[in-house]
Amino acid sequence: MLNGALPFRGHDESETSFHIGNFLELIKLIRDQNEVVGKVTLGNAPGNNQMVAPSIQKDIVHCFAQEVLKYIFQEINDDVFSLLVDESSDISKKEQMVVVLRYVTCGIVKERFVGLVHVKDTNALSLKSAIEFLFVEHDLSLKKIRGQGYDGASNMRGQFNGLKALILKENSSAYYVHCFAHQLQLVVVAVAHKHIEVGKFFDMISSLMNVVCASCKRSDMVRESQKEKVQEVIGSGETETGSGLNQELSLGRPGDTRWGSHYKTLKRLVDLFPSVIEVLQYVEEVCENPCSQRQANGLQIYFQSFDSVFYLHLMLHILGVTESLSQALQKKDQDILNAVSLVKSTKRQLQQFRLDGFCRLLEKISSFCEKHDIETVNMEEIYVNPKNRRHKTNITYRHYYEYECFNTVMDMQIQEFGDRFDEVSSELLTCMAALSPHYSFCDFDPSKLLRLTEFYPDDFNDDERTTLEHQLQLYIDNVQHDELFANLKGISELGRVMIETRKHLVFPLVYRLLKLALVLPVATATVERCFSAMKLVKSALRNRICDDFLNGCVICAVEKEILAKVTNQDVMTCFQMMKTRRNQLM
């Protein structure tokens, strides 16, 4: 039940109820299947000692959660970690703060959920107080934090009064990294806000979603139309068939805060384009609301224009390039150096596309227009500004679309990449890059690694820095002549192999540097997943669940891997130690 985030209680738990809640129903099932258990449970147990009361259920959940947390803190073992935090309201409008810790154990990066805290105020001081309370409860220290990762909200990221600054006052080594995945999303949003035509395009996409997805009937029409067209192309042999192919599609609504949502929406629009146009025609002809008819007519005109097809394919390509980066950034074990490398690669791809991608893009656009009977433009004709047709522009359509549209959007996208990912050029990451095992440790630089120790004064004293200087020379010679270190893809693999070869014992100071690089956060995707679990546990039907019970349920639902390792004996021991009981939990 905890593993599946299932509810415990039932709406009606009386004897006449047909379903008395999952917890009691499960006990009934076990009782019916096991005669020994049946003799000592529910009605066959003393009335004051049945061990099924709501308070008992909460205590059992609390014990499971405590055993999960115990495992996590044993893995951390008083070592350094990074702090990932975000806040969101639950179904009952309570502000809940998720706390995730990122740490290294046995050379492997772990991101673990350690608590859901109800905060009555979301200012930085309140959030810090809540974090300190949680840390004291679990015997953690702010001094052990070596990285901070939050979203871009003002109450989190403010230079002077944000949570980042408050923690930095107490611990100068708790370096802040703005969520890379969130920054990537902001790159897309920023261009949409700054470029008039791109902004207009996404505004029209939103209007299209409102019209096409406004009712179940219209959504069904899109699916049915798509199904018919798939059957046609299968019949003509134009597409392959097989398991997982040609599945039912539907349009997805994009959102500024949902990573990758714009890309999925545009991709689906290309796949479902004729079906979407059919629905718009239906709305215009059949709908009794004149406003909806006008809106559908305007959307038809816009999306069947060359301009809209141009921006559809341009933004689809840009988002397609960044989608791989977005997916990679959301991995729990992603390390900061690999993330920086991926950001640089993505930026280079965009720069290359700006240099030689226009002709290829134009071919795709022309093919799409021909397939869907959309009028194209002669690229060699003089461009006519639709806003002022009498004014002569003296430029061709090709010049307009290549230089004033394509190049402008690409330049803005590339510029936003540089502005948003300013951490990439920071001295801290430049020094950390010297740890990279790529190409036989070609970036190895002892001076940068010695400089890196100065960023962490609490982790290296003067004697250790002197020792490290000599240790680095032996380390690089050793790993460059060891085949096991020859083809490593990043510092995550380097940490794992150092543990496997026990070189972390031979070069403990180098391994300490490596851990500091690995714990630095990349993205807050794990935090977002915790909020998703919270919404499963505390739903509209379970909106009165108390904070402690919610916290225990969410911990178990998120950390399924650890929950599977918790034994019944551990839980029973914890249960008996909580308070004096009339009887033991057997």
Go through each PLM region and give its residues:
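Alpha-helical structural modules in large enzymes and assemblies
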Residues: 1-586
